[in-house]
């Protein structure tokens, strides 16, 4: 940083610049979640050979989990989150709960990934 130049504080920014910065952060957040999702899909295919992983259309049913995994005669849905503290969208709790009553559904993030995949493995093997 140049001598005498103060770092801009977010709240002091022009509203349009603040909006652009906010959008920038959301884009990074989504990119990171999508990276986690891509790695997760690869892990699922390795862990459950022959499974089919479908990325659900987020515009079709708001709050419906991101992924559906079909393996043998069983299925599961997974809602991917960048972190355990990531904000949940409206209806996500409802659909994860509803789908879990029918079969298996969880919120999954890097912090609980191992636990969720172990639970999923037990479900698919039962």
Task: Enumerate the predicted regions with their spans.
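Catalytic phosphate/metal-binding cores of nucleic-acid and nucleotide-processing enzymes, i.e., regions
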Residues: 2-126
């Amino acid at each position: 940083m140049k001598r005498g130049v103060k770092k801009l504080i977010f709240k002091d920014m022009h509203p349009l610049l603040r909006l652009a910065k906010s959008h920038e952060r959301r884009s990074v957040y989504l990119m990171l979640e999508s990276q986690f999702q891509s790695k997760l899909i690869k892990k699922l295919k390795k862990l459950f050979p022959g499974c089919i992983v479908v990325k659900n259309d987020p515009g079709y049913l708001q709050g419906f989990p991101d992924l559906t995994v079909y393996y043998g005669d069983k299925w599961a849905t997974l809602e991917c989150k960048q972190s355990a503290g990531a904000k949940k969208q409206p209806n996500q709790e409802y659909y994860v709960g509803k789908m879990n009553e029918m079969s298996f559904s969880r919120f999954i993030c890097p912090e609980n990934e191992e636990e969720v995949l172990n639970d999923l493995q037990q479900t698919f093997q039962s």
